[in-house]
């Protein structure tokens, strides 16, 4: 069976045979969720589709990437603690690994409902590349940035936000 969302807190629900993750309650605070498969060697590619924005205002501000196993699912911002490496859909920047990107213009316009964030993790060199709808996108985490092992991870912020995991996708 392919990987699925496995670790999540009380404000999040999983459906669709473990592939759909939705923040259903709580305030507008990031909450971590992770998939089950431990990624420690080889090259892995997958996509996360933005299934829905926030119920109140369609906000799609979320983090998508990888994290060290065991991060607290009732908290967020694990990239600030050196435990996660994410693309933030709100500004298109990467967060984690001491990478400091310039503040982006047009916040909130980078990813819309239905868009897919592709990820290609090379565990052998510790790099992570991002894609938008199958095309290379934005900054990357260069070789040596990411410490293995990791798990697929997201942080959802607002009630109603939902993502769908597609764990086996080919990305160049």
Per-range role (PLM):
Residues 1-172:
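PRY/SPRY (B30.2) beta-sandwich protein-interaction domains
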